[in-house]
Each structure stands twice: as C-alpha cells, then as structure tokens.
Amino acid sequence: MGIKTLIWLSILVVGIYCEISDEDAPVHYCFVNPPPKTRLSPNLLQNITTCTHLVYGSIPIDRDTGYPQYSVSDVESGYDIDNIRTFMRLRKYHPNAKLLMGVVRTKPFEDAATSVKVANGLRSHVKSKRFDGLFVTFNGIHLEYRASTSFLETISKDKKMSLTFGVTGRRVFAFDALRRLQEINDLVEYIYLDMGELPSNEELARVTHINPLFYNGSIPFEETIQGTVEELSKEGILPSRIVVGLTAGGWKFEIKETQDPLKISHGQYAENNGKRVSYQDACRARGAVIYDWQTMNEITVYRQTWMSVNLPTIKAMGEKMKWILGQKFAGIGISHALFDDPRGDCGTDPLPAHRLVMELIRNTIPANPAKCTRLCYLDPEEVEETFPIDNLKSDYCSHIVVPYFALDLSDKMIEEDKAEDLVKKIDDWRSKIVEVAPRLILSVGSKQASTIWQFLLGNDFHRKELAEGLVKAINSTNADGLEISWTSQPMVSDFDKKNLKSFINDIVAADTAKMVEIVVATSQQSAYSDFYDYEHLNKTASLIVLHSHRLHSDSLPFTGHPSPLRATSSMTNQKMSWESLLSHWVEKRVLPSKLVLSLSASTLSMQSLADVRSSAATPFGQSAFVSMLRSKKGDIHSQQEICESLKSGTGVTHWVDGAEVPYLRRYDQMVAYENTRSAHIKAVWASMEGVGGLALHNMHQDDPSAVCDNRTAFPILNALSRAQVCQTCLKQHDFKKCEQHDFVVSCNFELKRSTPVFKTDIVPYERCTEVVVEQATLTLGGNVNFNDVQQEQVVKNLTSLRSKMVKCGMVLSLSCGDSEKYLNSILGDNMTFAIGNVMNIMEKYKFSGVQLDCEKVIRRGNHIYFNTFVKKLAQKFESGKASNGCNRTLSARFSHYTQKPSTYYSVSLLNRLSHIALRMTDKHSVDLPFFFNHTKPEFPSTEKFVNIWKNVGLKPDKLVLELSPFGWQTGKKVGEKKKMTQGVNCVTAGNRAVYEHDYETLTGMTKHENGTINMPMIEDFRYKIGYIQREQLGGIALNVNGDDYTGICGRGSFPILKSVYSSHKCR
C-alpha cells in the first residue's frame, strides 16, 4: 500500500488570536491521531486558536520498559515521515498550549513495581521528545487494581510534566473504577471523560447514540453525559476537574431486515458491529434525517442503515457544548481533528466541531452571580476602546452603572459622548453570562451643575417631561434601572430638596410597568445640609449611593484622603469619613440595607508645599497647592501606576492607622489611594455595620489587565468580593421539633475539671440544634470509655436533662485514640464489637448522635478501615431512631491538618453524613486567620481550607465551621500566649475596657497593666456567620465553655451564642 498524502486546504479566516490565559477560562483539548503511513499537515489546527492542550496519537505502551510502540509514520523511518516532529511545529501557532503525547495501555500491570518501572521509562522518553506531558488512557480493567494509581503517581512526581488521565464513559461504572478515580483525581491536571464509548459498546453490535446528552426513554441515564458526570460528582470528582470529551462524526449500524429503521432505539442489536464514521463521510450520507432533542443528535436512516451523528451546528452539537460550559466543567475536547471534515468536504469551513468549540469558548465567561450588592461605575469619557471587560468576573458586580444621560437646558437630556458604545460593549459582555449578568443602571446628571438641575426640576412641565423621557429611554434599551445623580455640585436650598422629591415621584409615576429600578446618588455636602427627604428616599429608592469616595478634593489647600474610614486628629473636617457619613444617614432613620458606600480605584494626587518624602509629619491637613495652581502632568491616576512607582523605587507607600488607608510619597507629591488592604478593611467594616452594598467608582483604573501581579485583574474588586458579606437574619430553630435545620448551631460542651462553675443545668440547649459532649475515647478491644469517673458523672447529669432538651440533639464526640497502630488494632480486629459498644453507650446515656474525632490517627495504612467503620456505623444509625424520637446523626470532625481529604476519606461517604465540622484553631484554641494570604499561600486560613474541602467535592451545606470564642493575652516571653475565655477576659480587663477592632484578624485588642488582650468580639462572630451564609455552608460550631456562661460581662449568659439569632444589622 502506498503512502497516503493528505494536503489540507488553507483555512482563510480573519480573526483575532485568543490567548487562553485566564485560570477560570474553559480548556480546549484538540486531538491529532493520524493513521499509519499518513502524513500530518503542519497547519491542520493552525486557526483553532483556543486549543489549550494538543494531544498527539494514541500510542501503545504495553512493553514493560515503558517505551512507546510507534507506528512507521510517528517517527522517522523508511517512509520518510516524522509526524511527531510535524506535530511539535504546532507550538508556533499555539505558544501557550501544552503539547501532550497520547498513550494507551491495554496490557494490565503485573504489580505496582511493574507500573512504576513503566512510568519511569515512559516519563524519560516523553521528555526526550520534548512533549510537555502525557495524556494517559487505560483500555482494560486496570482501574480494578491499585497499580494503575502507582503508575500515575510516579509520573505525577515530575511537577514540570502535565498529566491528563482519559477515561471512557464505558469504564466509569466498572468495578472499583470510581474509587480509583478518586485516588487519581489529585494526581492529574484534569480527568478527561471520553463519551465516545459507553457501557453499551461492550457489545459492538448494539445500536448506540453518539455522546447522548440527556435520557430519552431508551438510553439508560448512566449512558448519558448528564448521568455519567453526576455519578462522578457524587463521588467527589467535581465538574471543575472534568473535561468532557465529544466525538466528531458518529456511529453507523446496518440493522436487521426485520427491524424498522424508524423505530430502532439505543441498545437494540444490529445485524453487524457498529462502525465509527467521520463527519465528512456522515454529511454525505443519503436518507431521512430525524433530530433527537434529548440526545442532541442527528439520526440518518437509509434503507437498513441507521446512523447517529454529532451535527456541528449551534442548535445541535452546540447545545451539548453550551450545557457543558454552563455546568462549569473544566472544558471540552473534540476527538479528533481528522474526523472533523479537515478539508471542508461538507461545504462549510474545515473542522466545524473545533470551530464551534472555539466560538463558544470565546463567547463564554465563567459565570457566578454576585453574592452581595456591589455597584461598578464605568465612565464612557474615561474608558478606552481597548478596555478588557472580558477580564471582569461575573460575580464582581451586581450592578454596572454608566453615566449615560447629560442634562441640557434646551433638549432636557442628551446622551453622554461614547456612552452608547460603552453600553453596547457591556451588553455584549452581559449576553455571555445571561443568567447571572449584573443589572445595568444608566445614570443621569452626574456631571451637571446645580443651576441646570434647578432649572429643569423647578418647572413642573419640564420636570415631568424629563421623567417621562428618561423612563421611555430606559425601556428602549437593555438597561434595568436609572440612577439620579445630583452630585457634581451640592444642593443649596429646601427648594432643591422639594424638587428632587417631586422628580423621583414623577419617575415612579411614568414607570407604569414598574420595571425601572431607581437608584439615588447623594453628595456629602447635601447630606450634611439635610437637603434630602430621608423618609421619602427610604420608600422610593431601591439603593441610596453615598459618595463617600469624594470626601476630599485636590481643589482644597491642604492634604487629605478621599475615603478615610475614620477621621484622624489632623483632618480639617472631622465629618469627612465613612464612619461619620454613615452615622449621619443612620441617625436620620434611613435603613442601612438601602445604603451603598463608595470608594474609588482612581487616585488623588496633591502637591505639598515642601518635600516631605521622608518626613514623619502627619500626612493629612498639611498645606498643599490647589489643583488650579499646579501642573498635573506627572500625576499618578491608576492602580497600575501606583505599582509601577513602587517597583521603580520612585515612590514610598505609608499606612494611616485609624483612617485605615494608604498614601504614597513621591518627592513633594502625595498620592492618596485605595489598595487591596484598605478595600478589604472597608468591606469587613461595612458588612459588620449592615450596610446594603458597596460601590467602586472609576473601575477602569483598577488594573484591569493584571499589570501589578500578572495574576489578578481588578484587584480591588477582587478584595471587595472576598471580604463583603450580606447578613440575613437567622430564624431560631424550634428545639421541640425533629425538623431538618437549614443552619446548624452545634454547641460543643467540654467534660473537664477546669470549668467547675459550668453546671450542666445551664447548657443552653434551646439555642443549639445539637449539644456535642467532648469527649469519650474508643479504646483497645473496641470499648468506649470516658477519661475518668467525674466525666462520666457529668454525662449522667446531662442525661437527666434529656427530657427538657426535647428534640435538641445530644451528640457524643468520640476520639479514636492517639496512634495509627492503636486504631488499626481496634478496627482491624474488633470493628463489629466497637460498633456494638457505640450503639450501647448511645442507648445508655440517651445520645442522639456521634461525632467522630479521629483525624490524627488516620493514615494511608488504615484509612480503608476507617471508611468501612463509618459506612457500617451509618448503616446502623439508619436502622432506627434516637431516644428523642428523631433520626440519629453521624458527623465527623477535621482540622487544617487535613490538606488532601480525598487521599484518606471517601468524599461520597462524607457527603452522606449529617455534617463535617472544620476546626480552624491553633494550639491555644484560638481561631486561625480567616482570610487566605496571597503573599503567604502556605499559611493556613479558614477561607483556604473551606475551598480545599469544597474543591474535593464535599457539599458546601455539609461544612460546619467551628468558631472559637477564646482569645489570648500576650505573655512575658516573645510569642507566648495565654488562652482566655470571654468571662475571664472581662474579669481581667474590666467591663468598661475599650477594644480597638482589627478587621483583618477579626479580633478586638485592648491593653492593660498585665499586657495586651486580643479577643474575638460579637461583631466578629456575626461577620463570620455572614460569610458562612454567603458561601451557603452548613452552619457553625461553638465551644460554649469559652463563652461568658456566667454573664459576668454584663450582657447576660452566653452573649456570643445568643447573638447568632439576634442582630439589628442583619436583614
């Protein structure tokens, strides 16, 4: 047979190179698998610019040396073809893509040692060929054995090598496959789910649809894309770890003469084995065409031929792709290019399926809704055409506000310059994330002088005409609302106040359909002059935006900051702070939930009268040139310019305590600005105050191209979205009912001698969904014992309260000992006896549940024992009710020391438990930092470990965060800490001690004669509960021994626990 030479037509497409650099963007796997003796075209995938992973071949690796078994055309041979070398030239067109060698192992590994040997040999060879990594597939029963994990584990040790594991839908449901995939999940970059082969394909003569999306009556649910990925998700393999592989072309079957081709269905037997057909062959097939809207496939029937084809159009294969992207899978793959009409024989552009993926990925932005109210302002006069709006994450903004209408004396209103173009750009971006797109608000009058406002609003006819025109204009666009912004200059009289009120009423009257959201922007000058009708705004405006980002101006003859949190002593006007402005509006009885506080991504540059670059003088209140008397040529305007000044060493940044803001000194220039730290603090403070939302003005200055760290676009918005929470009021549960609680409040009660005053009869069970009693121990032989007689007596006392606790759970915390060998002995030889003893002690002391606290003794050697123990114990629990008549509960407790949960635990099993408690404390029982620190990524934090557990597949509503009420007093030695309860703190520092709040550590700090005390405050707990609600976690756990259970602090007993349900700042 001679050499086949395939000459691909040049693909003439005008387009912009799309670099997939966003870590959240979908990946695109592109496969090239040329048959033997076929020459690969070097420009085959030249214009498919979204390929992030290029995979060559499906090369056998059945030799135990690991050396790939190449075909005659893979590498240079007598045929003068070296397709691998040609493939490597694709790097020219895809400089950011990873080039992977595709390998397949059919022969099972004899043992783990063989798998390691094969892996090492293969890894060395792949490096010699200069591939970036491997795409590994097993064609056989390999997933039944752990040697397959050893093979991938050995390859994964090379951190420079990219590794993808491919598994077909057919193999997912094989024996032990899901367990093996859980182990593999942490070893690879992605798991590639190839839906080209299904369980039905075990018998090649069975009629099979190609990549069916949904169940259609004849297709088993587990053979659909939806069913397969749901099974993986249940086992803790999240969509974000899965690339869904689709197939170019389809399946072709010759059916029996006795069968009606129009009535044939998935799973029936054909006359002969099915054949895979390329799209270029399928598109030329004759016959009747039927479209199946469940499988999203085209069915072609001609005589006794039946064919299921992936039709590469937006309404067919595109629906599968849109579903995959909409479900937030890691990405899509198409196998393979040579089956995807590479020459355009079907009359369309070549590679139609690949082009469809490219189009959808380019038009897809990973979409999540904003979890709190955040207004993002873009000024059409300031925003350049190249503004990278696609870098804006969908959850950063709940509203986008554009100054759109200018007021005009003759025409009433006109469009701002470039406003229409900007709105079109925003609309295009919103169309990519339709379901969770931010609301679009068009602003009127933000740049007009008060005289124009007074003229138009002072005349009843002009005012009503303006209101009707604005509502009509809003309804003619895709906008959702209108912002009324009389803010460029302040109002000057009560007439202005009256006319603004009438104008709002006219807009409400003109909006007969009640579709226009009304936002009112306010200035600090008008507010402090009481030129707003506060009661009227409370009733009519959905949001009231305070211009708290304009509290200082460069037109003033002294230095200052546009948005200090609090006033400093040197500030000329003590009212010009966030704290004072918010207090003013709240004192006027405006609902805090309606108020939006503003900050800006832009800077305020001022020129001091002397060179104060190295001066330690108070930064605010110094004499400065007013803006009209100085040149602004060298001013810093944006976040990226701040970064450039700091990197070059021309500027030095300083921090102002109290005001909680930074400023930069550059010779005689002072630049006041916001950074991620100040934005974080403002977001936490505003959240604690129950403020309705935050607004970021001049968003285009917030480093939209990630110049500062080459990682985070819009860093201030990112900081706001991470730190802002929106508290909703928690309804106290009814402890007299056995209902499933939406929010768990787990009260941990310690059995120890150090708290003799804590009598069992004051345990606040009515405020707890469960009381967790700490702690009994599982001992050798499978017995359950308390540490001493006194502890057991305390348990007996609690049991006597059981009737009063009614349906409130009483849960036994059960330790598994102190060593791995200890647990091995218990569960290896006495598991059944241990389970029986757990049930006996529950019955004896009327416990309704058990919380397993076994983390420190779980290792690779015994984790299977533990998972089996949990599974059998859960089955026992399900067989009956607890002593209080409710379902028994089984939970588990872990800490930040478990950094790879899926290595030791069955995530699917944990998802079936009542909940998982996360203990995030140090050795002093003090909470670890709450937020992840990007500068110290190795440092533990609550945010980091919540994400770790969510990323391995634990359901968010199963996660219960333990919040510590303990604080600490600094000791005499460096680093020494003395743990303190809330009550001891009040005794030590006194009830009247004043605490300085730290919005980063979420503690209060006070100094007294014996040292410094740091204590978590009630506001901190309320904030953390807001975070838990925002992330839709399961609830909180609180050690009630650390709360002020005696009421010595003057706020009644258990003030922290009671604050869970009572706060005037929630909504």
UniProtKB/Swiss-Prot annotation:
Keywords: Carbohydrate metabolism, Chitin degradation, Disulfide bond, Glycoprotein, Glycosidase, Hydrolase, Polysaccharide degradation, Secreted, Signal
Highest taxon of the lineage: Eukaryota
EC number(s) given by UniProt: 3.2.1.-
Any one GO cellular component localisation term in the record: extracellular region
SUPFAM superfamilies with a match to the protein in the record: (Trans)glycosidases
Ranges of residues in domain GH18: 26-364, 372-727, 743-1067
Localization in the cell: Secreted
EC class of the enzyme, as a word: hydrolase
PANTHER family xref list: CHITINASE (PTHR11177), CHITINASE 12-RELATED (PTHR11177:SF317)
Role summary: Putative chitinase.
Membership in a protein family: Belongs to the glycosyl hydrolase 18 family.
Protein name, as recorded: Chitinase-like protein C25A8.4
Organism: Caenorhabditis elegans
